[in-house]
Design a protein with these regions (language model features):
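Helix-loop interface residues and adjacent transmembrane-helix termini in multi-pass membrane transporters
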Residues: 4, 13-16, 50-53, 128-133, ...
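Transmembrane alpha-helix boundary and packing residues in multipass membrane permease domains
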Residues: 8, 12, 45, 49, ...
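Hydrophobic faces of transmembrane alpha-helices in multi-pass small-molecule transporters and flippases
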Residues: 1, 106, 110, 133-140, ...
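Alpha-helical transmembrane segments of multi-pass membrane transporters/permeases
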Residues: 57, 70, 125-151, 162, ...
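Short alpha-helical transmembrane segments in multi-pass integral membrane proteins
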Residues: 47-114, 156-178
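Generic alpha-helical transmembrane segments of integral inner-membrane proteins
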Residues: 1, 5, 35, 71-83, ...
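Small-residue-rich hydrophobic transmembrane alpha-helices
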Residues: 19-79, 116-135
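Interfacial/gating helices of multi-pass transporter permease domains
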Residues: 10-30, 97-101, 161-162
Length: 178
C-alpha cells in the first residue's frame, strides 16, 4: 500500500518525472520486502517449531540470531544499494531530472533498510506468537502514518520525493514502535 499511496501523492503533487522515478526504484523496494518476508517466514516457522517442541530457550536463541541476521542483511543491502545505485541509474539513459528523483527517494529509503527488515519480521513473529490483532494494529498504524506524513511532507512542507521516502520509511517502521 505504501507504493500506491506514494504514487498518488507524487503524481498529483510533484509530477510525472517524480512518478517515473518512483516506479524505477520500486524493484529495489520490492527486493527489500521479498528478503524481509523470506527471513520472517522462515524465522517464525523455526521459532514456532521450537516452541511446539517445548524448547523455549532454543526458540529465544533462534529469535536473537534472526534479529542479528536481519541487522546484518539490512546493512549489506544498504551498502550494496549505495554502491550500485549510481551505476544502475547511469546505465538507464534517464533524464537528469528523473535520475535526481531516483537518487532522492532511494538514498533516503536505503538508510532505513535495517528497521524496515526488523519491523516486517516482528509483524510475522507477532502472528506466530498468537498476537495477530497486534500485528494488524501495527500494519494499520503504519499505513495511516504513511498517508498522513505523505500529505504533510509533500503537500504542506513541499519536501518532494524526499518527503515521500521519509513518510514511507516512517510508516514501515512505526509497527516496530507500536
Amino acid at each position: 500500500i505504501y507504493g500506491v499511496v506514494d504514487g498518488l501523492f507524487v503524481s498529483n503533487l510533484i509530477g510525472t518525472s517524480a512518478l517515473s522515478a518512483l516506479n524505477l526504484v520500486y524493484p529495489v523496494i520490492a527486493l527489500v520486502t521479498a528478503i524481509s518476508t523470506m527471513l520472517a517466514t522462515g524465522g517464525s516457522a523455526a521459532i514456532m517449531r521450537k516452541m511446539g517442541e517445548g524448547k523455549p530457550d532454543e526458540a529465544k536463541q533462534d529469535f536473537t540470531f534472526l534479529i542479528l541476521v536481519n541487522v546484518l542483511t539490512g546493512l549489506v543491502m544498504c551498502g550494496l544499494g549505495y554502491l550500485f545505485m549510481g551505476k544502475i541509474f547511469g546505465s538507464m539513459s534517464l533524464s537528469p531530472e528523473v535520475s535526481a528523483y531516483c537518487w532522492e527517494y532511494l538514498s533516503r529509503y536505503l538508510l532505513f533498510t535495517v528497521p524496515i527488515l526488523l519491523m516486517n519480521n516482528f509483524t510475522l513473529y507477532m502472528i506466530a506468537a498468537g498476537k495477530a490483532s497486534l500485528s494488524l494494529l501495527c500494519s494499520v498504524a503504519g499505513g495511516v502514518t504513511n498517508i498522513v506524513l505523505d500529505y504533510l511532507f509533500i503537500a504542506v512542507f513541499g519536501m518532494g520525493l524526499v518527503g515521500a521516502a521519509i513518510a514511507t520509511v516512517c510508516g514501515e517502521c512505526i509497527g516496530g514502535f507500536v
